Amino acid sequence: MPRTRTPLAAIVLAAGKGTRMKSNKAKVLHEVAGRPLAYYPVKRALELGASPVVVVVGHQAEAVEAALSAALPEAPLRFAVQEQQLGTAHAVLAAKRALRGYRGPVLILSGDTPLLRAETLEAVVSARRRARAAVSLATMTLEAPRGYGRVVRDARGRPARIVEEKDATEAERAVREVNAGLYCVDAELLWKKLAKVGTANAQREFYLTDLVPMAAQAGGVAGVEVPVEEASGVNDRVELSRANRVMVGRLAEAFMRAGVTIEDPARFDCDEGVEIGADAVIEPNVRLRGRTRVGARTRVGAGAVITDGVLADGVTVNPYTVISEAQVAEGAILGPFSRLRPGADIGPEAHVGNFVEVKKSRLGKGAKANHLAYLGDAEIGAGANIGAGTITCNYDGERKNPTRIGEGAFIGSDSILVAPIEIGAGAYVAAGSTLTDPVPAGALALGRARQVTKEGWVAQRQAEKQMKGTATGPASARKGRPAARRAS
């Protein structure tokens, strides 16, 4: 990743409400690949070596600050508040105090551009340095530039000014080169020129673009054309969805080039920050969320959803398994249709089968719960076998209680283990038992009613029913009328 060799600060503009999102949440908090929109331009500036990075917040300022601080806890972030949203120049001025004493270039970028690459930022920064210009700015060429500020160049082909669409003439609106909202400018020049920006425009706002003609007079402006995909901002849900698809596609491509098989990248979904080891196989419609780590040679079946899960090497996750804040050791087999809730710890070569739910429990090496079970607050020893329908009754209405099952124990189908309870190593629990007391190692426990078998009961019952019907007779006979006869 490129890093600038000279001092560099950055300002990320993230104060707007984003009315076109039609949301109660600030626009920059909407997520792409599991991260807030503003996370990406901040992260790219950091990758370039910018320090500090000042984030200008406004609408829902506390929430934006909290989200970025949580996502980038070690980053040299500073926050500046734009109390009123009076335009982009006004927003940049809000960052002045946070950069007090800093001398050097300042990179200015928008908080709603998640697809920018660090290489693109480096191109804008280096263009100013190479051209010895006062300002460098990113531009892009659009087939339909509606809504964007047009870049007007001088006779020598250098950017001379940017005209917002509402202020543009017909000739200027025909220009297809537009402002991408990405600038690099010397800090001293920035504060000096912004003090002169006024509101003589259709929006009655302080435009950052007014800096361009001033810079053209002070040392020139260097223009850098950048890819449309990268510089296009996210303004509504449609654009958010497109940006998410592009970002996930980039992640998928990086995984595949690193040796991961993704069977259908178009039906793959993951968050930024997910890790996948070499020779892992990801089937269609898998979702990998949060800080999930998938080990080498692990196979994740179709429809699985994993959030903050840690899977070791060689794990098999069968289709439609749901994992959340759980860890799985090497060689374990999960699913299909199993669920690991927070605190589940599945040991090496253990099996958690279909419709088995595990919460805050550890299964030792080779332990098996293959069908229809609930295991909560349990410690299950190596090699233990949990039969279908087994339930650990861990909650007594006030607190959670533990269940301990020893190594090699065998729990019969449809058993109910009322916690707190301990089943010793090698013990057997008969099918259908409800247990409340400890079971010693090597013992057999039965906790069910004794079976009673009544031979001939069905025939006796049928005879009794027949006798009852004969004694009562048909309804017509009881009323003194002859019974109706059926034609033969």
From Swiss-Prot:
Pathway: Nucleotide-sugar biosynthesis; UDP-N-acetyl-alpha-D-glucosamine biosynthesis; N-acetyl-alpha-D-glucosamine 1-phosphate from alpha-D-glucosamine 6-phosphate (route II): step 2/2; Nucleotide-sugar biosynthesis; UDP-N-acetyl-alpha-D-glucosamine biosynthesis; UDP-N-acetyl-alpha-D-glucosamine from N-acetyl-alpha-D-glucosamine 1-phosphate: step 1/1; Bacterial outer membrane biogenesis; LPS lipid A biosynthesis. The active site is at residue 371. It is found in: Cytoplasm. It is an enzyme of class 2 (transferase). Its main location: cytoplasm. Residues 259-488 are annotated as: N-acetyltransferase. Its cofactor is Mg(2+). Residues 478-488 have a biased composition (Basic residues). It comes from the Bacteria. Mg(2+) binds at residues 112, 235. Residues 1-237 are annotated as: Pyrophosphorylase. Keywords: Acyltransferase, Cell shape, Cell wall biogenesis/degradation, Cytoplasm, Magnesium, Metal-binding, Multifunctional enzyme, Nucleotidyltransferase, Peptidoglycan synthesis, Repeat, Transferase. It holds the Pfam family NTP_transf_3. The keyword Repeat applies. Binds 1 Mg(2+) ion per subunit. Residues 459-488 are annotated as: Disordered. UDP-N-acetyl-alpha-D-glucosamine binds at residues 13-16, 27, 82, 87-88, 110-112, 149, 164, 179, 235, 341, 359, 374, 385. Homotrimer. In the N-terminal section; belongs to the N-acetylglucosamine-1-phosphate uridyltransferase family. PANTHER family: BIFUNCTIONAL PROTEIN GLMU, NUCLEOTIDYL TRANSFERASE. This is Bifunctional protein GlmU. The gene is glmU.
